[in-house]
C-alpha cells in the first residue's frame, strides 16, 4: 500500500540547539518526552563512560541535554559526539510529540516513507520498529547510545588520518559542482596527496555538493584553487569523514551490541530508503537494518535529489501528503521541490500539538546500600557491632568520667539544678580520636570540631572504601552529583566549648550544617548538602531524603548517616526530668521490667546509589531500599506520645510504594526504645498491619538494636538500618537481649503472629521460602514516624576468571605512619585469606580506592608474591613520597627488537589494544600493504618469513597501540624520543603525524627499501667498547673508508653500516683487538648510502602528509636536539643519516629537560633503548621502565611498570586499566584505613559548678579522667590558670617584666598528681616521700587576658614501677608540651645515706665561704639588695622573697644564703610543696647568673632543665631559718651552665637541687620568645656594693660549643639563632613558630613535604601568620606567599633566598594630621612580587569600604617582578573608631604609601571606595609635585558634587538595602566577628563619604592616564534599584550605567580609558571573573610603565 505520510529526518549537521530547546520546553507537558530525554541521556552517559578519557573530556560531565549543549557551545565537542547525539534526541523528541498527537502515526498498519541522510538514518531506524510511543521511547533511548558510538567511531577513524582543529567538510553551490571531480584530481596530483588524505565528494546534487577531507587538505584546497575561491563556499560543522568509500571500513560489530531490542521487527508498511542504493533497506529486524545503515553512513556517497525522486514512487498519488519535518533540516526545500515536481500536494507538519500523556514509571525506584561504616558502644566497626548482637551483649555502663562527673549531677528525685536521675549510658570507647592531618585540619581547629563531625568524617571515608567509591570513577560517582545527608540532633560540643570562650573555628566546628558541608568540601563533591534534625529520627530522615534525592535524580550517589555523642549533662538532665530515661540501666525492649530508655552513642554512615547504577558499577550491594515513607502523629494526645493509627498508616504507605503485601515482610527492626508506651504502641501497630494471626504462614520476627547498644537518639535510625542490612549478608537474625525470660505482657501479641527471638534464627531465602524483605521503623520524640522497606540484594553473578595472570596491588595513605600500618593490615589479611582472588584484590586496591601521596605498590601473579613484596618493603626504611608528578619520557624502540607474538597476550585479552591494532591493519590494507597482525598476535608466527614491510608496520603499529594504551591509563609523555624507525611512533605520540600518516609513511618507506635495495649485500655491525675504543675506530681509515656510522648510541657504543663483506673483515679486525662487536641480523644497511635509492620516493610520499606542531617536546635523534619543525626533508635525512642517540640524550640532561626524578618508559617490544639511555645517563633502574619484554608475559611487564609509575606519584586511570575486565572482577572487603589519630576530647566543665567544687590543691584543681588496669595507672588533671589563687602565684613571678608561670608551679602540679594517685585522693593519708627528676621546660605558660586558660596534666605509671611520668600542656594545644618530668617514690634509707655523704662535702665549702666573707674576700648582700640585683631579670612579689642575707664569692660562682620561708597569706591555700618555697629555696643559683652586676645587661641566663630535686616537704617549716648553699659551673665549651643548691637545717640536709641547667641568650631573644615587643632598658643604675676585699670579678666567661642545641627549649621548639650571632631569628624558624602557634601542630609533625593546606592553613590564617612574621622580623611577604610556596620545603627554600637580600622593614615614623600626631598607621601588605624592585615601580591598591587587604587576595599575577601592595584601613580591626573626615583618612593612606615609596612616579588604584581614596591620594601627590603614572579605579562612580541635604544618614539597614553588604554576606557567615567587623567598617566608610566634598585636580596636574574599570552587571535587579533610598545610592550606582566616565572626567581630566568586564561589583573580585580583571589591569600597567 502506498504511503501518504513522510518522515523527514535530515542529517546530523543541522544546528541542534534551537531544536533541543524546543523539546525541552515541550517536555514539561509530555511525560513520554520527559522520560525519553532522561533515558536517552542515561544511555549516552553509559556509552560516554566507555570512551577513552580524551574522548570523555570533549563531552564533559553531563546530566541532561542542556549540559550536552554546554559541551557544544563551549567548543569542547571536537569529536562531534554531543552534536550527533543532540540532533538525534531532538528529532526523536519531535516524533514523540507528533505520535502523541496522532497515535496511528507509528502503527504497524500505517504506511510510512522515511527519509534520512547520513546520521539521519539512525532516528529513522528507531521509528522503523516502534509501533507506539512507549516502544519508540524504549528503542530510541537505546539508539541514543548507538549514536554516541557512531560519532566516536567517525572521530576515531578521522583522527587516525589527521588530528587537527577545523571542519572536515564544505559545501559548494552553483555550476562549479560539475567541475569538482576535475578540480580535486588536479589538486591531489599537484600536491602529491596520498589516497587516504584526499578530499572527496560525499554528497552531491545537480546544484550543490559537499566535499569532505582532512581539515588541512581542505584549507589548502580552498587557498590554492582559483575556481573554488570564486565560488559560494560554506564551511560545515563536520567532525570527521563520512561517506568515505576510499577509507577502511570500521568493524560495525563494535557499534551494535547484543541488546534484545535488535530483534524487533521492522513494520511492514515502513519504507526507509538507502541513500546509496536508492531503494528500501532490506531485512526484517533492527539487527538486519543497522549494519546497512552504518555502511551508508561511513562508506557510501549519496545523491539526495535522486533519493527524493525515487521516494516519490512509494507515495500515494492523488492524495495530499503529510510531511513530518522532525527537526530543522536544510533538505526540506529540496524534498518539497522534488515532490511538487512529481505532482504531489504536500501538507507540512512541524510543531505538533501537546497532549498530556499518562505518567510512565521512572526506573525501579529502588536504592542500593553499597557501603557502610560506623562506631558503636563496644564496637569500632560494623562487624564488631554484629558480634556484640550475636553474643547478646548489653553495653550500658556508668557515664565515663571523661564526659562529665555523673555523681556531681545525680539526684534520684530529679529536683536539683541540672539533676540527672540515672548515671547510665552506652558509650563509644575513644570519641576524641581524629586524624586531623588526613582531613587537612589543624589541631587547633580539630579541638573546636564537634566529635560527631570528626568521627563522621572517618566513617564516611571508611564507608566510601567499603563501597569502592572514588570520585569520577563512573557515571554515578561524578563528583558534581554526590550529595550528603547527615542527621544530627545535638549541640553538646558547642555547650561544652562555651566556658572556654569563642575561638575563630568554633562556628564551623559546632554549627551542625558544617558537617555535610565539610564532607563535600573535603571530598570535592558538588551535590546538595543537608543536615537534618528530627530528634531521634534525624538519621532516618537523612536516609529518607537521600533515598528520595536518588529516586528523583537530584544526585547519583548519596552519603547518609549521622552521629550522637554525649558530652554534657544538659540533655541527660532534660530527659531525666522528662521521664524518658531508665534509672536501672539499659533499654529493656519488649520486657516486663522496661522503665525507659538508656542513652547511647553511635556513628553510622551508608553509601547509596540507585539500584541500576550499583549493578552497572559492579558494586557490592548489601541491601536494597525498596521504599520509604514518613508521616506525623498529628492526633496523639501528647507530642511525645506514640500514635498507633499514624504508625499503621505509614506501614500501609511504605508497602504500597514497594508493591508488597504484609505477608511479604519477614522481619521488622523495631524502634523499640524500652519505654512502656512506645513499645506497646509499636507492637500493636505492627501486629495490626503485618502480623494478624491466621494471615501469615510463618510468624513475623521482630527485634531492636537498642536493647544491646542503647538508644543512640539522632543516630538510632542509621544504627537500625545498618543492623537490618547486614542481616541479609550474615543470613541470621540475632537474638533479642532478655528474651524470652523477661518478655513483657503485651495484649497484642496474643492476637498476632509475632516471634521475638531469644536465640539466633537462620535468615536466608531458603529458610523463609521467598525473597527476603523487612521493615525498619524509626520514630522520634517530636511525633515523626519513618519507615523503610529493605530487600535482600540481587544474587551476584558467577564471573569468569580474569585472563590477566599478573596484577598490581596498591596501598596508599596520607602519612607514613598510616601507610606502614595499612601495609601491615593488608599483609595480615592476605596471610589469613590466602585463597582470595588476586585479580579482585588488585581491582579493589586500585580502581575502587581513593589514592594518597604516600604510596607503595606490588606486582605479581600470586597472593604470595604480593605478601613477599610487602614484607620486603616493611623491612626497610620508607622513602619520602613524591609530592609532584615527575616528568615522563616515552622512548620508542627502533628496528631489530621484534619477535613473533610480541603483543600476543595483550592482543588476546585487551579489547582496547586489539581494536587499535586491527584498526591500523585495516588502514594499511586500504593502502595495499600486506597484513602484519600475526607478527603481533601469534607467538608461533614464522617471523623469519615476514617481509620488511610487515616487520616495520608491525613494530610501529605495536608502538602506536602501546602509546595509546598508556595514555588511556593516565600515563602521557612530557617528552618523546625514538630510536631510528621508532621516531615515527614518537612523532605520532607527539601529535606531529596522525596514525594513518605514520603507518602510510612507514609502509611506503619499507616498500621502497624492498623495491630499491638488495637484501644481504649490506649490513650493520654493532660495536661495544670504551669511549677510547670508539674514538680509535672512528679515526681508523681502514675501517671508516669502507663503511659509515649508522648509530651513535653512547660514548662506547656505535653501529656501523656498510657492505656485508667489508663488515665481516672489520668484525674480525675488532675481535682481534678484544673489542666486542657483532653483525646484526638485518637485511639492509639502514642510515647508510644503501638508502640513497629510496630518497626521492620517500620525499614524494612524505610531501602528501600533514606535519603538525608537536604537542609535547620531541628530541630528534637525527639532530641530537629538541626539534619542532618537521617536514618531508626531515624524514629523508632521518632515513639516510646517522642516529645520534648519544647527543640526543645528552641534550636532554644538559638542557634540564629531564632530571633524576624523570621516568623513562620504553614503548616497544623489548627494553633495548633503556640500556642505551642508562649508558648515557645516571638513570636508576626504578626510573627506567619498559612496556614489553621478550620471554615475559605482556601483563608482567605492564603491571610492574604501572606499579613503578604509581609509586612515583602518577595519577593512574585504574578504571580504564580494568575496563575490559570489569565482568571478571569483584569488589572485596579489605581492612579499614589506619587513621593516624590524636585525642581531641575535652571534658565538660561548668563555670558556676567549678567554683563550688573544692580544688585538689591550689595549683592542681580537678581530676578529669582516671584509668587503672592490671598493668598501669593513668590520670588526667586540669588547672584553671585564671583561678584567683593560682593566678596570684603566677603574677608574682615576672621574667624581664613579663608574667611567666614559675617552674615551681610545674613541680607542685606533678608532685600533687603523683600524691593523688598514691593516696587515692585522700587528704588524710600521710605524705609520700617523692623526688622530681628530669624536669624540662619547653614552652613557657603566660596567663592570657581572658580567664579561660586551662592546663592539662597527664600522669602515667606502670604498676611495676615506682616512677610517674608527667606532662603538662595548655589544654587548647594538647600537642604542645609545656613541661615534663618524672616523679619517683623516694627510697628513704638510700636518701639518708646520700645526704649524710653530701653534708661532708658541703660543710667545708660553707665554712670556707663564710671565712672569706669575714675576711672581706666575699660580698655580703642583705635581702633587699639581693633582690634589687636580681631584678636585672626577675621581679618577685613578697611571697617569693625568702632570702634574708646572702654571701657571694667574689667571682660570683658560689653563694650562701639564709632563708626564711614565706608564710601563707591565705588560709585556703593547700600544697604538696609550695611553689613559693621551691623558688625561695632554690633561686640562689639563678641569682649567681643574673644578679652579677658585671655581666652584660644584653644577656640573660634562663633555666631550661633540672636533673633532680629532692626536698623533704614534711620537714619544712616557716619557723625555721635555713641555709642554702649554691655553686655554678660551665659546661665545657658551650652556652649551657649548671647550678646546684643544697638546703640545710642546721647539720641536716633537708633538700637539694642538682643539675639545674641555664642557657645564656641575648635579652632580645628572650623578649621574642615571650612575645615582648621591646626590651625593657634599665635606666636606674644599681649601686655597686663596696667590700673590704677585691672588686667583683667580671661576668662569667662563655665558651661556645656545638654539643648543645643552639636555641633554648622555651623557644617553642624552633631552631633559632646562637647567642653569639645576630639577635634576629631566621625567617624560616619564625614561620615554623607561627605555624605551631596558629595550628596547634607539634614541630615533630612538620616535615619538609608538609603542605600548608593539609594542616588547616586557610587564607585568613595565612594572613595572620605572615603578619606575625612581619612583626617579629620586619620582613614583609606576599599575602599569597603560602599559596605560592605550598609546602614547608618550598617556603624554606624561598625564605633562604630572600635572606640573601636586605629585608624591608615596616615604617615606624609618625605622620602629622591636622597638627596632631597620628596614633594609627595603615598596614601595607605585600600581595605580589618582591618587596623591592629596582626595575619596576610598585602598584598601591587601597582597600575597599571593608578596609581589608583580603579584597585583593584573588588577583592573578599582575606582572613579572612587579611589587603590588594593598593598603589597609587604620581602623580595619576597630571600625567603630573610624570617625575622622575623608581628608584625614586619605592623609593616612598617603603617609603609608610614602613610607614604602618616598618619591614618584606612582601607580595607584583601588576597588570601590578604595578607588575614591586612591583618587585623593593621587591628587595630594600631584599637588606636592610628584608624578602619578596611572590611577586605576575599579567600579565606583565619581564622587560628584551632590546636594548633601538630600542624602539620608547612612545606617546599616540602608547600605544593606543598596547591596553594599552583599559581598561580605557571600563570603562570611553573618554570625562571625569578622563579618560584623567588616560590615561596621563599610558603614563607617559610607558615613565618612557622606561628609566629603571632593576637590578636582588642578589644571596641568593629572595622572598620565586614568583607567576606569566597570562591572557590567548590577548587584541588585533594576526594580530594586528604583526603590533605593534617595541620594545615597547615587554615589555608588550611576543613574545610567554607561560604562564611561560617570563623573570621573570632572575630577581627573580627559585623559581616561574605560574597560568593562562581565560580573557584578563583587563577583569581579573573585574567580572566575577576577582573571579577566587581572588581564585588564595588566594591560593598563603595560601602557604606563
From Swiss-Prot:
N-terminal acylcarrier protein transacylase (SAT) domain: annotated span: 7-243
Active site per UniProt: 536 (for beta-ketoacyl synthase activity), 671 (for beta-ketoacyl synthase activity), 711 (for beta-ketoacyl synthase activity), 980 (for acyl/malonyl transferase activity), 1293 (proton acceptor), 1479 (proton donor)
O-(pantetheine 4'-phosphoryl)serine PTM sites in chain numbering: 1659
Positions of region (N-terminal hotdog fold): 1261-1392
Chain segments carrying region Thioesterase (TE) domain: 1719-1913
Lineage: superkingdom: Eukaryota
Keyword Phosphoprotein: yes
The record's note on its domains: Multidomain protein; including a starter unit:ACP transacylase (SAT) that selects the starter unit; a ketosynthase (KS) that catalyzes repeated decarboxylative condensation to elongate the polyketide backbone; a malonyl-CoA:ACP transacylase (MAT) that selects and transfers the extender unit malonyl-CoA; a product template (PT) domain that controls the immediate cyclization regioselectivity of the reactive polyketide backbone; and an acyl-carrier protein (ACP) that serves as the tether of the growing and completed polyketide via its phosphopantetheinyl arm. The SAT domain at the N-terminus facilitates crosstalk between the two PKSs atnH and atnG encoded by the cluster.
Protein name in UniProt: Non-reducing polyketide synthase ntnG
Organism of derivation: Nectria sp
